[in-house]
Amino acid sequence: MNGIMLVGSAIIIFFLAYRLYGRWLLKTWGFDPNAKTPAYKYEDGQDFTPASKFTVFSHQFTSITGAGPVTGPIIAAMYGWLPAFLWIIFGGIFFGAVQDFTALYASIKNQGKSMGMLIEQYIGKTGRRLFLLFCWLFSLLVIAAFGDIVANTFNGFASDGTLVTPNAAAASISMLFIFVAIAFGIFTKKVKPSEKLRFIIGIILLILMLAIGIAYPIYLDRMSWLYIVFAYIFIAAVMPMWILKQPRDYLSAFLLLAMILGGVIGVLAVNPTINMPAFVGFSVGGKDLFPILFITIACGAVSGFHSLVSSGTSSKTLSNEKDSLFVGYGSMLVESVLGVVSLVIVCSAATGGHLPEGTPFQIFSTAVAGFFSMFGLPHDIANCIMTMCVSALALTTLDAVARIGRMSFQELFTVDNPEEMSTVQKICTNKYFSTIITLVFGYLLCLGGYMNIWPLFGAANQLLSALVLISLAVFLKTTGRKGFMLYIPMTVMFCVTLTALVESIYGIFVKLSAGQFVFAVDGLQLILAIALMVLAISVAVHCGKELIGVKDASKAELNN
């Protein structure tokens, strides 16, 4: 087996899936290209801000494409390339893309409501509160994990004190991104340039930022960057979308798409041989293929976090209902392509059936930088650009989840009549207070390091997907739309994630019995794991009762 066959077949399959299955879903559920979307109906200059199709796509794509499609397939390759490849293909088409698209579709059909508010409308207030609490706890895990990843990526010093220029240059470019994005956002808002002019200006700005950042790297240690990153995501979470988040995502999309394109072209040019067996075994290193494979490869196949982006932010900026397929379904398939490229890279770098040493980011960055070097780009510059791309993956996810965590906390205390709100509720629904409380808890978790959080994050992420799928199935049924395509994915995800959480809890108790239990790490994980499991089962019971008991189209009109 070689790289061209895997990447080429994946691209063809994803293209056909978008054209056939994706369009069939949109046609089956119905859309109105002339309807006013929530972005126009409730435009407030803050969260509801109409944007072009590619702008919304760039926001969706850069927000959902975190570290997962790089790290997941590389780690899961220990079972062989075939299980990982099949899960990315089938998971991406029938699980992840369907979930992301349906969440976006349901939201734009319901005043741009987030998943929590949708659950209240179709399932009830209790289900909504439980789901929002789950989402908020999940947001803390994401903030902690990705905050630590970004701070480590920007760390300009090695353990022995030597300077790490690629990291420092990537940090410098990222800081430039923030200020340039604000200026670009104001320019776009005031001048309203054509898409062609906007594209040209975006490319020029990107090249200038890369050149300046590489020439003037910023050397700071991990803790300094941790403070800066959390200060940035506070600002990003409270500022209007059009000022910072949208333009930053638009510019970041060029980087990420170039990275994927570079990886694809590199694979096509080199046609690397796959040096890993197709299948290694059902258990490797004491880790069972089920459920570990399906937890490890999340963002490349299906990720519950994506639904929060679809319903929490993208639905509030979409200008036309027909674009929901391109944004929701299309962005997930592009991310799946990145997952396949990552898988090919690690399997081609294997020797004697053993994976290469190093972190997934190091393996991926080194390989793709090598591809860029083949086209005449100096290796140092290529390595710096790849480090920047990898950090952009995590940083765009980080500022998106900070906003989503803030909104989830606010919605927990929101009531139907604002005049009936107590003083505590008014404080908790304040966007500044809710952002601060979210980031404080995220920061405390972050101090333990992302490796202590990642296993729980993976299980919680996929469990969120199961909850979202069953909630969306209720929406489809109550509005008279076909929802059978969600039944198998939601069942599979529940089985996978509950099994993984039970194994995690069991593993912590084994540590406790062996005297290796550390409360600051294991105790916190145990509390969160049990809380997430109880909340998930409670939400699933509420949704299940509604799904079984409700009659078709009993709660809403088909084309609401």
Regions found by a protein language model. Give the residues of each.
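Membrane-interface helix-loop-helix modules in multi-pass membrane proteins
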Residues: 49-110, 121-125, 142, 147-156, ...
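Flexible loop linkers connecting adjacent transmembrane helices
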Residues: 23-49, 75, 85, 89, ...
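Extracellular loop-to-transmembrane helix junctions
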Residues: 2-19, 76-106, 116, 171-181, ...
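Extracellular/periplasmic helix-exit of transmembrane alpha-helices
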Residues: 267-281, 333-367
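Membrane-interface "cap" regions at the ends of multi-pass membrane proteins
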Residues: 13-70, 253, 292
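Transmembrane helix-loop junctions in multi-pass membrane proteins
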Residues: 2, 17, 70, 82, ...
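Membrane-helix boundary/coupling elements in multi-pass transport proteins
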Residues: 67-74, 91-93, 99, 103, ...
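Loop-to-transmembrane helix boundary motifs in multi-pass membrane proteins
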Residues: 125-140, 330-337, 382, 411-448
